[in-house]
Swiss-Prot record:
InterPro entries assigned: Toxin_endonuclease_YhaV (IPR021679)
Phylogenetic classification of the source organism: Bacteria, Pseudomonadati, Pseudomonadota, Gammaproteobacteria, Enterobacterales
Function description: Toxic component of a type II toxin-antitoxin (TA) system. Has RNase activity in vitro. Acts as a transcription factor. The YhaV/PrlF complex binds the prlF-yhaV operon, probably negatively regulating its expression.
First-tier enzyme category under EC: hydrolase
Primary gene name: yhaV
Domain of life: Bacteria
Deletion consequences: Deletion of the prlF-yhaV operon has no effect on virulence in mouse infection; the disrupted strain is as virulent as wild-type.
Subunit structure, interactors included: Homohexamer; forms a complex with PrlF (SohA) with stoichiometry PrlF(2)-YhaV(4), possibly as a YhaV(2)-PrlF(2)-YhaV(2) complex like the MazFE complex. May dimerize in solution.
Annotated Gene Ontology cellular component terms: toxin-antitoxin complex
Organism: Escherichia coli O6:H1 (strain CFT073 / ATCC 700928 / UPEC)
Protein name: Toxin YhaV
Length: 154
């Protein structure tokens, strides 16, 4: 999947924080395909990549404002409330995104990997890691900076 692109009427962008994780997953799947072209589709990374595409194309871009994507207070309150997240991969993976209904834009902010699976109370928990990223400003918390940083990377 290349970014930016238009999906279900939404302009879909990938922030560098998401793009880095996504590209690593794509590279892993391509390496698996090179090693074992007949069986790579059975591997966990290949299945995960397929689920990521499905989540983006059939869930996020269909209704980004769905109540199912609200994170409650998992990222704290205040300025992080505008981030949404989708759960997948047996509840261990999270893909965080922001959207603007007015602009019809969705920005994929970050997706955790096998090193940051959802594990309550751990330093490597997806919410803990993403909260720290937001505190450091990468990705930025405000829409204007997020949009600018995302556009500069494409």
């Amino acid at each position: 999947m290349d970014f930016p692109q238009r999906v279900n009427g939404w302009a879909l962008y990938a922030h560098p924080c998401f793009q880095e994780t996504y590209d690593a997953l794509v590279a892993e799947v391509e390496a698996l395909k090179g090693k074992d072209p007949e069986n790579y589709q059975r591997k966990a990374a290949t299945k995960l990549l397929a689920v990521v595409h499905k989540v983006i194309e059939e869930h996020i871009t269909v209704n980004p404002s769905s109540p199912a994507f609200r994170h409650g207070k998992s990222l704290g309150s205040g300025k992080n409330k505008d981030w949404s997240r989708v759960k997948f991969g047996a509840g261990r993976y999270r893909l965080f995104f922001r959207y603007s209904e007015k602009e019809k834009v969705i920005i994929l902010g970050w997706m955790n990997d096998e090193n940051t699976l959802r594990t309550y109370g751990k330093k490597t928990d997806a919410y803990t890691v993403f909260s720290k990223m937001l505190k450091r400003g990468h990705p930025p918390a405000d829409w204007e900076s997020l949009t600018q940083e995302t556009e500069e990377s494409h």
